[in-house]
Amino acid sequence: MKRKAMAWTLPAVLVALSVVGSGAPSSARSSAARVSTTAVGPQYDTTHVYVTPGKEDAFVDSWLATFGGTHTTKALTDVTPTPSETESELVLSPVGTLSVFDFRTPVPYPFGAERTGWLMSGFDRGVRLARQSGANIVVAPFDDPIGKDAVVQFPGGINAQLYWHTKAPSYAPLETVPDNRVYLTPDSATAFLRSYLRFTGGRIVSDDRTADGGDLGLPGKTYRRVALGSPFGGTVVSVTDGHLPYPFGRETTGYAVKDLTATLRKAEAAGAQVLWGPYDGKGRSNAMVQFPGGYVAELHQGRDI
């Protein structure tokens, strides 16, 4: 497939990389100011994809062949507070925005454990709100050439990166908004929900304590499934005993598609592997897919949140 590359200079590429963040457009800042959150919009909240070294092109080509979209020109840069080097690019697809990292050096701890990068309308306020919400700051705020970053951890060990840049990007709205997929134990669920909902300004959309275990490869069993909505996008929390078959729990994001069968066919033709499914549940079908470079994603059709 011919890749649609956006011809950006290195500074512009860095602006796009969610691991080092971007500033909010003025219209988005105005909107965010009206709510009790520092969110800007789901298209600025990017899934972090750390590929197997040398597999960045294969991953991006496969993703774009499956979902469509564009990508920025690759940049070789340091995106951590301690010395490191990664080749990085941003993928803008209709189903979600991804920051892709192909590290040339070992990845400094705890980078690689964060699931997403959240653009803050106000960085300092975002860090304060994270602390006030009960999250730990696991990477203290640090400057990069064009902005600021920090990594926070919510109860249950869920990491996310907060970022902000002085120069604002402008991305088109997504066709479908992806879900953050979180796996927790009963011991951590209450504390996580309290902290996460306070930080995101979110709400509980549904809380099914007897959800179909078939959704997680456990037919005949049940689990607790909590769907959350917020200005950052959707989140699906699966509360289980941790007895999960592979690859459940390895995915961090779920992507909504209009035709799951057709999408899986495209993915396989583009070099991806269907690891599980599709499974038809209550009003939705889902499958687990691994793309070149090792990235595992949940794909679903129908009601999710």
Which sequence ranges carry the predicted segments?
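Vicinal oxygen chelate
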Residues: P42-G54, E89-L90, F103-A130, K148-Q153, ...
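Short beta->alpha transition motifs characteristic of CBS
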Residues: D143, Y163-P169, L299-I305
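A cross-kingdom feature marking solvent-exposed beta-strand/loop segments within repeated
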Residues: K74-D78, T82-E87, S99-V127, R131-D149, ...
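Short, charged/polar, Gly/Pro-enriched secondary-structure boundary elements
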Residues: G96-S99, G157-Q161, G233-T235, P245, ...
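Core segments of cupin and vicinal oxygen chelate
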Residues: T38-G41, H48-G96, A140-F154, V182-G233, ...
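C-terminal functional regions that serve as terminal interaction/effector modules
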Residues: T235, T252-L260, R265-E268, Q273-D280, ...
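Secretory targeting and sorting signals
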Residues: K2-A28
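N-terminal low-complexity, Pro/Thr/Ser-rich intrinsically disordered segments
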Residues: R29-Q43
